[in-house]
């Protein structure tokens, strides 16, 4: 299993605000969050209590364009959300956001888990060819900028 993790401290907002934003995000809000990089993010199919929601997202991470559907496979309100990536079939890839409130704001841990369990782990070295050091660096820089920018947006919405 390949794990790509970035921790970002964002002042002035809460974990609940981050999770709520992600659960209710529209294409317009996503594009405003990072114009030209965030292209689309919206819920296609909503489930009771949001577990199982199907979303579509389209964005650039560095020079790579990532277009996927994602299904919420885990949700802890105000704390954690996990999407499993889907591209025709469920992929062995998950995007996790873990949020923890602190005295001045929230710490967001952005984690991508890519790979197989059990016997499928033998295929992980092939995945590692796609997930090289350059992508790891781009993803880390991306998450740092992205969540600081989200903090600015959520603060602006709050102060209206």
Sequence positions of predicted segments:
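A contiguous binding-surface segment within folded domains or other stable secondary-structure elements
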Residues: 66-86, 90
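Short, surface-exposed coil-to-beta transition loops
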Residues: 3-5, 65-69, 91-95
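Hydrophobic pocket/interface hotspot
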Residues: 18-22, 55, 72, 108-110, ...
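Short beta-edge strand/loop motif at the mouth of beta-sheet-based domains
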Residues: 27-69, 78
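A short, structured loop/turn motif at beta-sheet edges
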Residues: 12-16, 46-49, 73-78, 98-107, ...
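Hydrophobic ligand-binding cavity/cleft-lining segments
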Residues: 1-47
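Short, highly charged C-terminal tails/helix-capping segments
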Residues: 38-44, 144-160
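Beta-strand/loop substructures that line and gate deep hydrophobic ligand-binding cavities in soluble
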Residues: 85-141
């Amino acid at each position: 299993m390949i794990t790509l993790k970035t921790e970002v401290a964002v002042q002035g907002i809460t974990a609940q605000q981050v999770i709520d934003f992600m659960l209710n995000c529209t294409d317009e809000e996503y594009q405003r969050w990072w114009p030209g990089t965030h292209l689309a993010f919206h819920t296609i199919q909503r489930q009771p209590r949001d577990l199982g929601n199907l979303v579509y997202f389209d964005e650039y991470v560095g020079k790579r364009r990532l277009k996927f559907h994602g299904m919420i496979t885990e949700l802890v309100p105000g704390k954690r959300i996990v999407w499993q990536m889907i591209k025709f079939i469920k992929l062995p890839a998950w995007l996790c956001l873990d949020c923890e409130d602190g005295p001045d704001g929230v710490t967001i841990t952005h984690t991508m888990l890519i790979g197989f369990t059990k016997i499928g782990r033998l295929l992980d070295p092939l995945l590692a060819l796609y997930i090289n050091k350059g992508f790891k660096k781009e993803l880390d820089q991306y998450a740092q900028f992205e969540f600081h920018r989200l903090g600015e947006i959520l603060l602006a919405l709050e102060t209206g």
